[in-house]
Swiss-Prot record:
Monomer and homodimer. Has a tendency to aggregate into amyloid fibrils containing a cross-beta spine, formed by a steric zipper of superposed beta-strands. Soluble oligomers may represent an intermediate stage on the path to fibril formation. Copper binding may promote oligomerization. Interacts with GRB2, APP, ERI3/PRNPIP and SYN1. Mislocalized cytosolically exposed PrP interacts with MGRN1; this interaction alters MGRN1 subcellular location and causes lysosomal enlargement. Interacts with APP. Interacts with KIAA1191. Interacts with ADGRG6. It comes from Mandrillus sphinx. Cu(2+) 2 binds at H62, G63, G64. Residues 91-101 have a biased composition (Basic residues). Residues 44-84 are annotated as: 5 X 8 AA tandem repeats of P-H-G-G-G-W-G-Q. It is a lipid-anchor; GPI-anchor. This is Major prion protein. Residues 1-15 form the signal peptide. Pfam families: Prion, Prion_bPrPp, Prion_octapep. Glycans are attached at N174, N190. The keyword Repressor does not apply. The normal, monomeric form has a mainly alpha-helical structure. The disease-associated, protease-resistant form forms amyloid fibrils containing a cross-beta spine, formed by a steric zipper of superposed beta-strands. Disease mutations may favor intermolecular contacts via short beta strands, and may thereby trigger oligomerization. Gene3D superfamilies: Prion/Doppel protein, beta-ribbon domain. Residues 224-241 form a propeptide.
């Protein structure tokens, strides 16, 4: 009986010293599956946190950030920048600059601009064709019916290249009629003697108007130069500067 009592007492002592199986943060089964080697884990893992098949963060199959299947940034399937499937293949590019239309580059010579190929002549601004009476009803009617075929701009050189108005007007009429005739004839239209006579009258009036306009502008430019070159004005400008 004594031997049986001692054996029973020894078994009870060993049970008290034996660690409990399982439990939180012990060597047994653990939940979630984070533990020391040898413990049972649920679910089976390869060394990462809960729901980490390959060692990444929550919901990371291959070690990237949240929602990153292969280690890129948010919404990056293969490691590129935002919205990039892989590398720089799908990067955003700036749109090409719109090409300038030829309509914006082409155009007639501007009023007062030097016309290339005419030896320094300039093209004046468009004018209304003057109402001219030629002394008989036939020519007056002919002019009214055909005036749209005649020039409404004149070619001229700067007024300071001429000694008087007559020289300016004579040169202006000749070059204008010549250019208009050549251009119009190239298009298949011919002028009669009556047309040439009427064009000379029309262009002469427009050349006189152009001379008066250019002379006034030239005089104003000269007056401005004289004003700003006077000693009092120069002294005032120097003081202001």
């Amino acid at each position: 009986m004594l031997v049986l009592f001692v054996a029973t007492w020894s078994d009870l002592g060993l049970c008290k010293k034996r660690p409990k199986p399982g439990g939180w943060n012990t060597g047994g089964s653990r939940y979630p599956g984070q533990g020391s080697p040898g413990g049972n884990r649920y679910p089976p893992q390869g060394g990462g946190g809960w729901g980490q098949p390959h060692g990444g963060g929550w919901g990371q199959p291959h070690g990237g950030g949240w929602g990153q299947p292969h280690g890129g940034g948010w919404g990056q399937p293969h490691g590129g920048g935002w919205g990039q499937g892989g590398g720089t293949h799908n990067q955003w590019h700036k749109p090409n600059k719109p090409k300038t239309s030829m309509k914006h580059m082409a155009g007639a010579a501007a009023a007062g601009a030097v016309v290339g190929g005419l030896g320094g002549y300039m093209l004046g601004s468009a004018m209304s064709r003057p109402l001219i009476h030629f002394g008989n009803d036939y020519e007056d009617r002919y002019y009214r019916e055909n005036m749209y075929r005649y020039p409404n701009q004149v070619y001229y050189r700067p007024v300071d290249q001429y000694s008087n108005q007559n020289n300016f007007v004579h040169d202006c009429v000749n070059i204008t009629i010549k250019q208009h005739t050549v251009t119009t004839t190239t298009k298949g239209e011919n002028f009669t003697e009556t047309d040439v006579k009427m064009m000379e009258r029309v262009v002469e009036q427009m050349c006189i108007t152009q001379y008066e306009k250019e002379s006034q502008a030239y005089y104003q430019r000269g007056s401005s130069m004289v004003l700003f070159s006077s000693p009092p004005v120069i002294l005032l400008i120097s003081f202001l500067i």
